[in-house]
């Protein structure tokens, strides 16, 4: 479960918030336009945060990875954006 403090720490200058509750967070990167769905399993072992990703709204999500914390998941997303922008020349 994501805590209120974790959810409030999401950078709204960087992300557009779409859905936010204790178990599910859907955000869009303002840098790349990519969509991210983060799901808290509620279990503390085996990567309790599952990260799903898609490039466009109409595309289906695919699993991008797992994280131990919401903060770690957000860091992974920002690193993905850096890769998209610098290596793939996105935007």
What are these language model-derived features?
Residues 32-62:
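Short aromatic-glycine-(Arg/Gly/Cys) micro-motifs in beta-strand/loop hairpins
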């Amino acid at each position: 479960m994501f805590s209120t403090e974790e959810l409030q720490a999401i950078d709204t200058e960087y992300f557009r918030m779409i859905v936010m509750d204790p178990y599910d967070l859907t955000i869009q990167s303002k840098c790349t336009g990519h969509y991210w769905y983060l799901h808290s399993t509620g279990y503390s072992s085996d990567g309790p945060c599952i990260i799903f990703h898609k490039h466009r709204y109409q595309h289906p999500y695919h699993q991008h990875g797992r994280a131990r914390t919401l903060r770690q998941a957000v860091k992974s997303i920002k690193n993905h954006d850096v890769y998209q922008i610098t290596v793939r020349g996105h935007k």
